Amino acid sequence: MLMRRKNIKIEFRYDGSSYYGFQRQPNKITVQGEIEKVLRIVTKEEINLISAGRTDRGVHANHQVSNFYTSSNIPIEKYKYLLTRALPNDIDILSVEEVDENFNARHNAKMREYIYIISWEKNPFEARYCKFVKEKIVAEKLEKIFSDFIGVHDFKNFRLSDCVSKVTVREIYQIEVKYFGENKIKIYIKGSAFLKSQVRIMVGTALEIYYGRLLENHIRLMLNDFTKEYKKNLVEAEGLYLNKIEY
């Protein structure tokens, strides 16, 4: 009997500290690889996740969305239990549902939000989850620097050299810098999509301007001048989180 092919959407979160990024890599432990491994065992099929975002090594996710196709007859309500039981504790399945066969977690996403956390109080138990700086950051001053990113721009200068994306134009919808407790800020960056390490280079560049190590117009130069190679000011991965996906 031929089983009907189903399109399954899963929403999940993870601590990226122990993984070589999200995307599957040969002989490396990745988030995608761990989930696909469990799904192959459960469904007895070859599974390929289609995902909204591909985070770097050490980057976390509060909300990630993937979908996959399967002809397995496993009841949809059992997937969450089976995945949760088999996956490591640093990957948490939030929901599993069957969706329209045309749904694509990557291409249908309308907005992706990242957050970056910075702390000026050193804490060894938070070393994997934020960036430490020596002095308090003035949120309003940093947010003003980030405003140059808002809108549609070519982010060719805000990606690593191994980025394979042919289209480098992206739209940034909103950037907010908010205090979080007494010793932290969270930088919220909303956009259509992002290039490899784009957010980390954006944050790193803004911080260099904030500390006076780059001129105030440096972001505008990088967004408009493609005649030379600019230094990539890349902040640590540990403070970055894929926070929200909207469709």
From Swiss-Prot:
It catalyses: uridine(38/39/40) in tRNA = pseudouridine(38/39/40) in tRNA. GO terms for molecular function: pseudouridine synthase activity; RNA binding; tRNA pseudouridine(38-40) synthase activity. Gene3D superfamilies: Pseudouridine synthase I, catalytic domain, C-terminal subdomain (3.30.70.660), Pseudouridine synthase I, catalytic domain, N-terminal subdomain (3.30.70.580). It is an enzyme of class 5 (isomerase). The active site is at D56 (nucleophile). Its EC number is 5.4.99.12. Pfam families: PseudoU_synth_1. GO terms for biological process: tRNA pseudouridine synthesis. It comes from the Bacteria. Belongs to the tRNA pseudouridine synthase TruA family. HAMAP family: TruA. This is tRNA pseudouridine synthase A. It comes from Fusobacterium nucleatum subsp. nucleatum (strain ATCC 25586 / DSM 15643 / BCRC 10681 / CIP 101130 / JCM 8532 / KCTC 2640 / LMG 13131 / VPI 4355).
